[in-house]
Curated annotation (Swiss-Prot):
Species for this entry: Methanobrevibacter smithii (strain ATCC 35061 / DSM 861 / OCM 144 / PS)
Similarity annotation: Belongs to the Thz kinase family.
Entry protein name: Hydroxyethylthiazole kinase
Binding site for ATP: R126, S185
Catalytic activity: 5-(2-hydroxyethyl)-4-methylthiazole + ATP = 4-methyl-5-(2-phosphooxyethyl)-thiazole + ADP + H(+)
Enzyme class: transferase
GO biological process: thiamine biosynthetic process; thiamine diphosphate biosynthetic process
Pfam assignment, any one: HK
EC number per UniProt: 2.7.1.50
Cofactor: Mg(2+)
Pathway participation: Cofactor biosynthesis; thiamine diphosphate biosynthesis; 4-methyl-5-(2-phosphoethyl)-thiazole from 5-(2-hydroxyethyl)-4-methylthiazole: step 1/1
């Protein structure tokens, strides 16, 4: 049995662990996508709590199975809440997942991202490839990176089959240096823990046309890691999101609908997907 076959065979068990454990996922995220993140976590069988007041975050994360911190809409109070909760999570070995939304577009986002990376142990970092390459530049892995289009990926960075190996090399080196799992999401997702690197060629081109698809994925990553382990949990989360996107697009096309319906159907299929469907629909490659 190949390593790929072994990974695929574990998917139903990993997904069942998420649903049976119902991991409490503490998300400190942005007000643009908070509702979608909570519903995505619920849809896969986990439980969200969206606490960010500095007076309670240490207590909340103490009962959580994972902490997801998302810098999409920064404030001084929210950054302080992220630091307090990350410190407490590290103290009790609760996994911390970082979504460095828009890192590279401002000095504040760069500063906060580096402070989190340097001071707290992270189980995973999930971002688009421009965000991941920006972190690679900030940490000395590469010398240059493109500037993001706001919080969206730079068009010149978009992952394709032509640049897959080049991007995978950067992601693997960054994962090894930071001792964490890195997931760069896009038309092709790449994830690595520095030793094993996986490409996932699933998803749909409609996904970037709704706000929050990346934030939802990061929250799902937190839930899956909270019930399993960083590399395999991140892989299952990426498969859930991308395959739900494919199915949502098919449903939208059958109804001649648009992005509003796509957003709703995405949540529907996150709820409906099972392990065998993930195996059947997955298009993964171990690089």
């Amino acid at each position: 049995m190949t390593n790929k076959e072994k990974l695929l065979q574990k998917i139903p068990e990993l997904l069942n662990e998420v649903k049976s454990k119902n991991p409490l996922t503490h998300c400190i995220t942005n007000f643009v996508t908070v509702n979608d993140c909570a519903n995505a976590v619920l849809a896969i069988g986990a439980s969200p709590i969206m606490s960010e007041d500095i007076e309670e975050v240490a207590e909340v994360v103490s009962i959580a199975d994972a902490l997801v911190i998302n810098i999409g809409k920064l404030s001084h109070e929210q950054v302080e809440a992220m630091k307090i909760s990350s410190a407490q999570a590290n103290k009790i070995n609760t996994p911390v997942i970082l979504d460095p939304v828009g890192v590279g577009i401002s000095q504040l986002r760069n500063k906060v991202t580096l402070e989190i990376i340097e001071n707290y142990k992270l189980a995973a970092i999930r971002g688009n490839i421009t965000e991941i390459k920006t972190i690679a530049k900030l940490t000395g892995i590469i010398s240059e990176s493109n500037t993001a289009k706001g919080v969206d990926v730079s068009e010149s960075d978009i992952i394709t089959q032509d640049n897959l190996n080049e991007n995978a090399d950067v992601i693997s080196k960054l994962a090894a240096k930071l001792d964490t799992v890195i997931l760069a999401s896009g038309p092709i997702d790449i994830l690595s823990d520095g030793e094993t690197t996986i490409a996932i060629d699933n998803g749909d081109e409609m996904m970037p046309y709704i706000t929050g698809s990346g934030c939802m994925l990061s929250s799902i990553v937190g839930s899956c890691i909270g019930a399993t382990n960083p590399l395999e949990g991140t892989m299952v989360a990426a498969l859930l999101m991308t395959i739900a996107g494919e199915k949502a697009r098919s449903k939208v096309d059958s109804e001649n609908a648009g992005t509003g319906s796509f957003r709703a159907y995405l949540i529907d299929y996150l709820y409906k997907l099972d392990g065998q469907t993930l195996i059947n629909k997955s298009n993964i490659e171990i690089l």
